[in-house]
Amino acid sequence: EKIKICLQKQVNSSFSLHNGFGGNLYATEEKRMFELVKPKAGASVLNQSTWIGFGDSRTDKSNPNFPRSADVSVKTANKFRSLTGGSLMLSMFGPPGKVDYLYQGCGKHKVFYEGVNWSPHAAIDCYRKNWTDIKLNFQKNIYELASQSHCMSLVNALDKTIPLQATAGVAGNCNNSFLKNPALYTQKVTPPXXKCGKENLAFFTLPTQFGTYECRLHLVASCYFIYDSKEVYNKRGCDNYFQVIYDSSGKVVGGLDNRVSPYTGNSGDTPTMQCDMIQLKPGRYSVRSSPRFLLMPERSYCFDMKEKGPVTAVQSIWGKDRKSDYAVDQACLSTPGCMLIQKQKPYTGEADDHHGDQEMRELLSGLDYEARCISQSGWVNETSPFTEEYLLPPKFGRCPLAAKEESIPKIPDGLLIPTSGTDTTVTKPKSRIFGIDDLIIGLFFVAIVEAGIGGYLLGSRKESGGGVTKESAEKGFEKIGNDIQILRSSTNIAIEKLNDRISHDEQAIRDLTLEIENARSEALLGELGIIRALLVGNISIGLQESLWELASEITNRAGDLAVEISPGCWIIDNNICDQSCQNFIFKFNETAPVPTIPPLDTKIDLQSDPFYWGSSLGLAITAAISLAALVISGIAICRTK
C-alpha cells in the first residue's frame, strides 16, 4: 500500500513571530540584544602595560609592614613609583627632615595616590604656616601636565649661577635650615656703610633632557616673600622689595615686584613666602631680587608633552587623630581629564590607623584588571554598549551609553523555526522545500546564539539553493559598519573638542555633551534595530538551507523506496518499506547525525581607538553568531493513504 509522508507544521501559540530582512522566525523565547551594565566604583585602567602610578607608603612594597600597610595588591604595587614618607610636593620643595624621593616614570595613564605626607599634620613652616593653597596649585599643575605627557620626572638639580655676594642662608622657622627648592641666599651687610647690600642677579637653566627623560615643559616654583608694608621690609631704608624671574628675551615670567605692585596693607611685621607654579620651556632664565635676600629655583618637574592620556587622582587623607587637607580632591576636580577616587567613610587602617584601609582597597582593586571604559562614575569591563545611567565625565575608552532597558531590541532565542523570506535581495535557488510564507514543518531546530549580533545577509545565494556565503555576509557587515563609522566620525571629533574643554564648573558644556550622548544612544538603538532584523533573516535562511540539505538527505537515503512528489513530501510503499525501513529513512538521529549548516561566524566591530583621547563615546559592538541545527528525537510526520 502506498502512503504519503510529509513534514508537519509544528508552530503553536506559545511561539512569537520575529520579522527580519530575508526571512522570519518563530521562537519559543527571546532576549535583549544587550543587557544594561552598571559601573564598578573606583579606579581601573584601559591597558595594564601602559599605565604607571606615583605613591607613598600605601603603595610601597619596600615598607616593612607590606602588604598589610598597603591599599593595593602586590601586582598593582609593582606599577607604582613609591617611597614611604614621600610625596611629589615634598620632593619638589625638599623641606628639612622630610623624605626626598626621585619621582619619575612613563605611562599613558597615570595614577596618583600621594599627597598626605604634606598636609597640616606635617606642620611644615618655612615662612608659611599654611601650605594648602600652594599644594592645591601644585597638584593641579601636575595633573594637567601629566595628562598631556607620556613621561615625567623630577629634576632635582638645576644648573645655576649665584652672585658672589650671596651665600646659602637658613631660617629659624625652617628647623634652622631651609628648603632645597627654592634655596635661600643672603648677603651679609654691615651697617651703616653697607646697610642695604647689592641687587642680586642670578641665572638658572631648565634642561631639554634629564637623564633619559625628555623635557619639553617644566613646572617651576616661583617663590618670593610677601611683606605687609614697605616699612616692614624697608627698616634700613633700602627701597622696595622685588624678586622677579625673566626669560631670555627679558619678559617677566614670575615673581613679585613691590616697586610697581602694592603691599598687602596688613598689620603683620613678619614676611610670608608665596610660591606660584609656573610652566616654562627649557632655556636660560634670570632672577633679579632686591638686596639681602634671594630665593633661587633649584628644582623642577619636567614633562615630555608627547601623549595625552587619562589621569586618576586618589584621595589621600590620614586616619583618625591626624589633620588632613583636601587639596588633591580640589585639584583633580578642577582639572579637565582628571578622575577622582574618593572614600565615603573615614580612613581606617589595618596595619595602623593610617595604613591598610579596606574601603580604599576595594576602590583600587580595579587597578588589577583592564577595563573597556573608565570614568568618574567608575569602570566597566562588560561588552554591552548600554548602561542604565549616564556615566559622568571625564571618561575614556569604549564607554557605554545611557539607555532604558525597554528600548533595547530583542532577538529570538530558544527553539527557532524559520519561515520563508520575501526580501527582494534573496534570489530563488534551484530547488526550494518551502514556498513563500510557508512555515517550516516537521523538524525542530535549535539555534544556539552565543552573542548578540549576527551577520548581514547581503550578497548572492549559493547556486546549490540555500543560504548565503560567510564571505558575502562578512562583506555586508563591513560595508554597514563602515557606513555607521562615517556617520559617527564628525560627532566624535566634536565630542573630543568638548572633552578637552569640559570641567566640573562648566555646566553648559556638560549639558550639551549629555544631549549629544543621548542622541548617540538613540541612533545606536536604531542601528541595533536594523541589525536585529538582519540577524533574524540570517538565522531563518540558514535554517532553511539546513532543511533543504535534510530533505536531500532523506531522498538520498530512501533511494528507490520513496519518491519526492513535492517539497517536503514523499510517496512510499509500506509493503516494500516497513516501519523499521521508514525509521531508517526519516528518523535520522536514531541512526546517524543529521547534516547541519556550517556555523555562521560573522562580526561587526564598531569602535574607536581604545585610548581615544577624551572620548566619552568610544564604542565597540563586537559579537558573533554560531548557528547549529540539531534534530530533536521523534520526527513528526503526516501519513495519508
Curated annotation (Swiss-Prot):
Alphabetized InterPro entries for the sequence: Capsid_hemagglutn, Hemagglutn-estrase_core, Hemagglutn-estrase_hemagglutn, Hemagglutn_stalk_influenz-C
Regions crossing the membrane: 617-637
Glycosylated residue positions: N12, N47, N130, N381
Positions of region (Esterase domain-1): 27-137
Sequence ranges on the Cytoplasmic membrane side: 638-641
Keyword set includes Glycoprotein: yes
Keywords: Disulfide bond, Fusion of virus membrane with host endosomal membrane, Fusion of virus membrane with host membrane, Glycoprotein, Hemagglutinin, Host cell membrane, Host membrane, Host-virus interaction, Hydrolase, Membrane, Transmembrane, Transmembrane helix, Viral attachment to host cell, Viral envelope protein, Viral penetration into host cytoplasm, Virion, Virus entry into host cell
Region annotation (Fusion domain-1) ranges: 1-26
Gene3D superfamilies: 2.20.70.20, 3.90.20.10
One Pfam entry name: Hema_stalk
One term under GO cellular component: virion membrane
Localization terms from the record: Virion membrane; Host cell membrane
Domain of life: Viruses
Positions annotated as active site in the UniProt record: S57, D352, H355
Membrane topology classification: Single-pass type I membrane protein
GO MF annotations, alphabetized: host cell surface receptor binding; sialate 4-O-acetylesterase activity; sialate 9-O-acetylesterase activity
PTM comment text: In natural infection, inactive HEF is matured into HEF1 and HEF2 outside the cell by one or more trypsin-like, arginine-specific endoprotease.
Quaternary state and interactors: Homotrimer of disulfide-linked HEF1-HEF2.
Record family assignment: Belongs to the influenza type C/coronaviruses hemagglutinin-esterase family.
Name of the protein: Hemagglutinin-esterase-fusion glycoprotein
